[in-house]
């Protein structure tokens, strides 16, 4: 039985997004592209090629293993690895920073030559392979201090430090030692941290001059300081210098007087501080790189691997003799030393007349079989007459138009050289990813069209796709977006997003090319409306409506008459305006409603009131319905809440308008608030809504329910039935009867006394 390996799947949200995209593309039995069919066929082939297991439970085990492969494993929330390129989401809001990187320490007289140097004039002597030895690694702390200058004084603006490893080594040629720094990242200082109040213009900004000091201190390593960089202290120096510090407190320093003076790459003399107040120069230089970079470039360069000892660099001391090879000649001859050519070694003549200079006469010389220049690229000649004619008249061929309609050069027609790979062109470098992975979040995609649709979720950047078959596939150029509205946070304003069900299949190729008809067809009438937060609205001044110009009777060949009085109208006179009488229309609607026998009187009453209000407004579009609906509620609020049946009919009307997507939800909420206020006013006035019950009468007995075992006389309770009363109620009734009898006796006595 073979072991089933688990494959890392996509995250939950992105997996659902891909599933929804494929589902919308298949609506109406329409596939989005041929790439989707190829992916399905590949999955089918992989499923059929899976070996079957033996045993009775083989089918169940196969299903379980398939489910394990399909299930995506959880991605760790805290991880040091980042799949995508470290781009800043808030690119526009970040400021530039000063980046200072300590590169190496080398001797001031040490020359630098690359490996593989050969002597001129075809001597054939190659350089010896580099054998780095005596590598010493020392733990140290690198401290950076930035000073600003004002009134001739130095002001400390920024101090930072980090631990690092100093690797001291020398090559086999016996050159001076060299130092490399490991496990140390460049210092990145935002420009706002080194702002200074300038003297000339009284502006708080960057100063005209900055000086940088780099100090290397001991980090508890017993090997400090490096013996190769600092010569040992003699007894005479120790005797005459009483203030000499212990060796573990010695500090290596390098100072840059002004970072604006020279280029970015700076070589500064290394000094050693053996005393508390003075230092002395050494024969070594510290190379530093100082430049202004954006945060994107800073993070991109930080991802580079730590610099190690490169075997391609050979440093040869001109004072030391050149080491010999095994067969005797010199190991390297770089056109002499200090520009002076060394004499050629004497060559012994062989019996056959050939010279032995390290190469055989039968072997071809280097570069003899290679062309001296690149081959001429011939232009392909097109012999298609139809295509030549289309190019001459400026007409687009059918194949190109179909390709552009399906996605053009960025569609699914171009087979990538590498399976689902793509290259991103960034300002500092290039990044190559597989499986159409997103550059920012690292999400993988099935095809290129899905990747282009996915990048619409990152509006902070613009992505320009280009297909280069000679370069090896797809190339994407990434730039910060030029839309200032999205940078300033315009998209953070609260807006209504109303989305409905899709009405047609999703053509992903057209969508990524800019055709948003599939999205706009789903948007509701309230989409894009700004939501005014409570308390932030600015009261608007009432607008003055301009006075309408009076309409005059035009001058025509035929006379015009008044529609009511039939009087002839003279040209130039004001046109008479008669009020519109809609009473006949209301009467007609009222008669038509009375003809319906399946409507209750309450329904007819509400419909007549609604028609009488809405027909007088002469609404020509559904856009004006919400405002007149609110006006109807405000005017008829007391009438609507006076009866329960009117409220029920009003609810039916609201449900109908909501189902037709004519009435927005905010209008319904406002209308409900108006009706609630009307009900509150009605209760304050002491009115009762008709149709509501008067309320259950308060019972005199507080304990009206008894168990059978708690009744003192069950037989009497069965005989009396509903007229049976408990003991407390019987006592109360007897007391009430006695009080009534006493009142009757008192009234009778008063009547007798009066008579």
Swiss-Prot record:
Zn finger spans (C2H2-type): 436-458
CDD domains for the chain: VEFS-box_ctSUZ12-like
One GO MF term: zinc ion binding
Keyword Transcription: yes
Protein name, entry field: Polycomb protein SUZ12
Domain of life: Eukaryota
A Pfam cross-reference name: VEFS-Box
Record's keyword terms, sorted: Chromatin regulator, Metal-binding, Nucleus, Repressor, Transcription, Transcription regulation, Zinc, Zinc-finger
Function: Component of the of the Polycomb Repressive Complex 2 (PRC2), a histone H3 lysine methyltransferase responsible for generating mono-, di-, and tri-methylation on Lys27 (H3K27me1, H3K27me2 and H3K27me3). The tri-methylated form is known to be critical in gene repression, and its proper placement is essential in defining repression patterns during development. SUZ12 is not a catalytic subunit but is required for the complex regulation of histone H3 lysine methylation by EZH2.
Organism from which the protein derives: Chaetomium thermophilum (strain DSM 1495 / CBS 144.50 / IMI 039719)
GO cellular component, one term: nucleus
Cross-referenced InterPro entries: Polycomb_protein_VEFS-Box
GO process terms (BP): chromatin organization
Composition bias, Low complexity: 30-42
Main localization category: nucleus
Description of how the protein assembles with itself and partners: Component of the polycomb repressive complex 2 (PRC2) that consists of four core subunits icluding EZH2, EED, SUZ12, and RBBP4, among which EZH2 is the catalytic subunit and which minimally requires EED and SUZ12 for catalysis.
Protein family according to the UniProt entry: Belongs to the VEFS (VRN2-EMF2-FIS2-SU(Z)12) family.
Region (Disordered): 26-79, 333-377, 392-420
């Amino acid at each position: 039985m073979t072991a089933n390996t688990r494959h890392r799947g996509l995250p939950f949200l992105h997996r659902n997004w891909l599933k929804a995209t494929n589902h919308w593309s298949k609506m109406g039995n329409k596939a989005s592209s041929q790439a989707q069919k190829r992916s399905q066929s590949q999955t089918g082939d992989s499923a059929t090629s899976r070996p079957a297991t033996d045993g009775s439970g083989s089918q169940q085990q196969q299903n379980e293993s398939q489910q394990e492969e399909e299930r995506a494993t959880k991605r760790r929330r805290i991880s040091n690895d980042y799949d995508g390129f470290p781009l800043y989401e808030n690119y526009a809001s970040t400021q530039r920073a000063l980046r200072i990187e300590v590169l190496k320490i080398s001797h001031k007289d040490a020359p630098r030559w690359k490996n593989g140097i050969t002597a001129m004039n075809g001597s054939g002597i190659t350089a010896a392979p580099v054998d780095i030895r005596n590598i010493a690694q020392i733990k140290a702390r690198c401290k950076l201090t930035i000073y600003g200058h004002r009134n001739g004084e130095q002001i400390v603006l920024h101090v930072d430090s980090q631990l690092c490893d100093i690797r001291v080594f020398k090559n086999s040629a016996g050159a001076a030692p060299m130092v490399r720094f490991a496990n140390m990242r460049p210092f990145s200082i935002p420009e706002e941290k080194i702002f200074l109040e300038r003297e000339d213009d009284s502006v708080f900004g960057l100063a005209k001059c900055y000086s940088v000091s780099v100090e290397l201190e001991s980090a508890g390593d017993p090997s400090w300081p490096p013996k190769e960089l600092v010569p040992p202290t003699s007894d005479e120096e120790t005797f005459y210098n009483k203030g000499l510090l212990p060796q573990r407190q010695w500090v290596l320093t390098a100072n840059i007087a002004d970072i604006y003076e020279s280029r970015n790459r700076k070589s500064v003399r290394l000094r050693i501080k053996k005393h508390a107040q003075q230092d002395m120069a050494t024969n070594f230089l510290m190379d530093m790189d100082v430049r202004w970079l954006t945060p994107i470039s800073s993070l991109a360069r930080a991802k580079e691997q730590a610099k190690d000892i490169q075997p391609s660099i050979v440093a040869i001391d001109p004072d030391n003799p050149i080491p010999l090879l095994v067969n005797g000649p010199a190991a390297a001859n770089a056109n002499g030393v200090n520009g002076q050519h060394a004499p050629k070694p004497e060559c012994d003549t062989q019996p056959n007349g050939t010279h032995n200079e390290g190469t055989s006469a039968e072997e071809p010389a280097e570069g003899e079989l290679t062309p001296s220049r690149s081959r001429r690229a011939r232009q392909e000649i097109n012999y298609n007459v139809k295509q030549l004619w289309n190019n001459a008249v400026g007409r687009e061929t059918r194949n190109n138009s179909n390709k552009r309609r399906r996605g053009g050069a960025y569609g699914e027609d171009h087979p990538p050289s590498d399976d689902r790979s793509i290259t991103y062109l960034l300002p500092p470098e290039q990044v190559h990813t597989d499986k159409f992975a997103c550059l920012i979040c690292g999400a993988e995609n099935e095809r290129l069209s899905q990747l282009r649709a996915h990048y619409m979720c990152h509006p902070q950047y613009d992505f320009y796709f280009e297909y280069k078959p000679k370069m090896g596939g797809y190339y994407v150029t990434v730039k910060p977006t030029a839309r200032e509205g999205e940078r300033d946070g315009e998209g953070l304003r609260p807006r209504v997003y109303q989305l409905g069900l899709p009405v047609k299949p999703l053509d992903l190729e057209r969508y990524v090319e800019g055709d948003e008809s599939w999205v706009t067809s789903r948007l509701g009438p309230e989409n894009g409306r700004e939501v005014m937060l409570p308390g932030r609205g600015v009261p608007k001044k009432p607008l003055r409506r301009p006075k309408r110009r009076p309409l005059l009777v035009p001058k025509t060949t035929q006379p015009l008459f008044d529609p009511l009085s039939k009087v002839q109208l003279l040209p130039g006179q004001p046109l008479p305006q008669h009020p519109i009488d809609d009473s006949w229309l209301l009467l007609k609607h009222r008669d038509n409603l009375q003809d319906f026998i399946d409507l209750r009187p309450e329904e007819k009453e509400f419909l007549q009131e609604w028609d009488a209000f809405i027909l007088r407004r002469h609404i020509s579009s559904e856009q004006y319905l919400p405002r007149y609906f609110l006006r109807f509620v405000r005017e008829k609020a007391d009438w609507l809440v006076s009866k329960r049946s009117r409220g029920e009919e009003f609810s039916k009307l609201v449900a109908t308008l909501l189902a037709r997507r004519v009435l927005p939800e905010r209008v319904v909420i406002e209308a409900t608030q108006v009706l609630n206020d009307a009900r509150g006013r009605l209760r304050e006035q002491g009115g009762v809504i008709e149709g509501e019950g008067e309320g259950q009468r308060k019972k005199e007995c507080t304990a009206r329910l008894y168990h059978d075992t708690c009744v003192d006389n069950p037989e009497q309770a069965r005989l009396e039935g509903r007229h049976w009363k408990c003991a407390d109620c019987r006592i109360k009734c007897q007391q009430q009867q006695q009080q009534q009898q006493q009142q009757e006796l008192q009234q009778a006595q008063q009547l007798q006394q009066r008579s």
